[in-house]
Amino acid sequence: MSRIQRCFKSLASAGFFRTVEDNKLELLSHGREYAKLLQQHWTRLRPLAAHLGATKEPINPVNIQRFSFPQSQQFRNNFQKLVKDHPRKAKCPTLLKHQSTCSGPTSNSLFGIKGPTLHLTTDFLVEPHRALEHFYNMQRESKIWWMRLSSNPSRYRIVPCDLAEDLNPNDYQAIDIRTSYGDAGEVTVEQLSLVRIVDDKDFRLPDARTGEIVQPTVIRSVIELETTTCALLLDGCDHGRDSQSLLLHRVLAPYQCGIACVESDSELSADLSDLCQHLKHVLNHAGLRLSEGDGIRTTKNASHLAEHLLETDMLGIPYTLVINEQTLRNGLMQLRSRDTRLAETIHISDVPDYLLNIFKN
């Protein structure tokens, strides 16, 4: 069994995705939660954008509309919505964000996705004389964004796309941002396309600096949510370490923290249970996402605890609070890290501020 095949099996057993007909992937409960967090993270990217919401009508696959999208009715409707609903942002340069369902997912060499899929689209309307400058800047920003989400940033690269002979490179440009899994194949996580629009009286904006009316050039970014979710999950699993763990970005991990209670003295079990419930309330109130179920796992000994921590590692949970009878006496507990598999001692009064600072940084 190859390394990537082991990752597929591990992610399926952990409840992130499964293989269905025609070797296509379907997200399971943990995978859907990860996709939801990734979608929210994308929404916060480039916060000055005008958010136009979701398009109800399904669209054709993105590869068909790579350069023809400015002629689509959806694009026209979005532009009119910008001018009407966001007049202060209707200047060049500006950003539009919208989401749409696609009935036909794009294919890649590593896996397919069971449709339909959600497209996260950003349209950057820029001054024509600075279009290439903006295009290169957007490439760099997007690649950095993906690298920050990755457990192995070096696997991401920018791949220029060949243009048809009838397309002028001054008017059309396209690149893919791809993540590589060695000999197993590559996955495109984002497509960037530049289209220069000429002589369209219905598509004009004032230049934000000069006030001159210009014909914007459009740079479009398209992210296929389900495909990129599976790619990032594979990224977190395919790390080459000896340990079986899922190295998800702390911000995107479906569960950020767990509570493990080592209960070796039955006489103190009620007090330990009360303490666990208190910690659970504190962490929930702070907005941290606890592990599945009630977030608390009771263990009897060190061996049982080690088995539980292996399970949390495979779920990608970054931190686990380990409490025992000693915690009742002096307030000290262990904060165990998924990435290092080491634990540090913290005081109960440090919860949740210490954890919140970790996730903010």
UniProtKB/Swiss-Prot annotation:
Localization per record: Mitochondrion
Keyword Mitochondrion applies: yes
Residue span of the annotated presequence: 1-18
Subunit field text: Component of the DNA polymerase gamma complex consisting of two subunits: the catalytic subunit DNApol-gamma/DNApolG1 and the accessory subunit PolG2/DNApol-gamma35.
General function of this protein: As accessory component of the DNA polymerase gamma complex is involved in the replication of mitochondrial DNA. Does not bind DNA. Essential for mitochondrial DNA maintenance and larval development.
Free-text tissue specificity from the UniProt record: Expressed in ovaries (at protein level).
Listed SUPFAM superfamilies: Class II aaRS ABD-related
Outcome following mutation: G31E: Loss of mitochondrial DNA which disrupts mitochondrial morphology; larval brains are smaller due to defective cell proliferation leading to death at the pupal stage
Name of the protein in question: DNA polymerase subunit gamma-2, mitochondrial
GO annotation, cellular component aspect: cytoplasm; gamma DNA polymerase complex; mitochondrial matrix; mitochondrion
Top-rank taxon, per record: Eukaryota
PANTHER family: DNA POLYMERASE SUBUNIT GAMMA-2, MITOCHONDRIAL, GLYCYL-TRNA SYNTHETASE/DNA POLYMERASE SUBUNIT GAMMA-2
Entries under Pfam families matching the protein: HGTP_anticodon
GO biological process, alphabetically ordered: DNA-templated DNA replication; mitochondrial DNA replication; mitochondrial genome maintenance
An MF annotation (GO) of this entry: DNA polymerase processivity factor activity
Keywords: DNA replication, Mitochondrion, Transit peptide
Keyword Kinase: no
